[in-house]
Amino acid sequence: MRALHVTLTYLILGAVFCFGQNSNRVITTGVPFLMITADARAAGMGELGVATSADNYSQHWNPAKYAFAENEKGVGLSYTPYLSKLVDDIFLGNITFYKKVDDRSSWATSLRYFSLGDIQFNEFIAGTIVDQGMERPSELTLDLSYALKLSNEFSMAVAGRFIYSDLKIAVDADTSSASSLGVDVAAFYQSQPFELSSNMAVFRSGVNISNIGPRLNYDSGAQKSFIPTNMRIGAGIDLFFDDANRLGFYTEFSKLLVPTPVAVYDSNKDFLGYRQPDIDFINGIITSFSDAPGGLGEELSEITTAIGLEYRFQESFSARTGFFNESQDKGSRRYLTMGAGFNLDFIEIDLSYLFSTSRVRNPLENTIRFSLSLNLDQSASQPSSKDSLDNSL
């Protein structure tokens, strides 16, 4: 593994926590790794998933989708290199498990681990470089969710999340690890198959408000950090041309529900910079819809947009593409994604690749992401999408 000098370390941390910033009012939060897409299926479709069909990684996007899962239980395993062009030991790992209790309800759990790699700290003393030791900062979350069908077409879910962030370094006695709790509230709609232009179709929509919880406190003398409370709203439609060919169109909108940074001045009215107001997370959520100094226009610029396409052939091969867009003043993340999936009986292998179209470099640019989905048991009570369509004809 590659050891990094302390000076370079802060550049990496800046990229991890504030990547893409080109405006002083870019919204930043603690534990931003919670917003990194872990599964290659969603990553290949412009990093969306709140209203796509249920899969093993629905825990991150919309746990209410598990109520519509076609398999009785499944496991998801994924590995995402981060800043791979700079270092080789920063990564996001994820494992997810779900199980259907019956045809109406299901539960799921997941573990997400983010490693910032080995970091070498040195200090220049009297013309000599003194070794201050090596650290391996990391963060993790442990989730548990429950989903319930309220009708044949609609479900809701709630998830609880334990968040732990260990970014403390031995050479800084003022810092410590931090922890918090988060809650997700999600809803999902999946229509019965219907006819559309001589083809059968299924419409889906979803909403998920995730990471609702208290702020993180790394230093008792400093301002606390908001966790990335986020709202996703999306919709999509699958068109079934025949028993073998299916094409899905999806779109999604997302907004961080944390305060917009505001200008801060000293007692002499000299400008000091931008900082988020020191308020609790509930007030932060409420004010996040109307606190932008630039008014409605700036509020709308805080909404990101993603569109995605997925083509499936005989449930054995998938091809995907998508586009993600963020305002230039709010981070300037813009990129095209592509991906593919291969279903080998009970194992599905997904791959994705990201092409940045922004002048701001993306930490995942030119990185191949992959994930595995293990479908452990086919449910007898939940028919496949093809069977559902056949039964409706």
What are these regions (language model features)?
Residues M1-N24, K255, L309:
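Bacterial Sec-dependent N-terminal signal peptides
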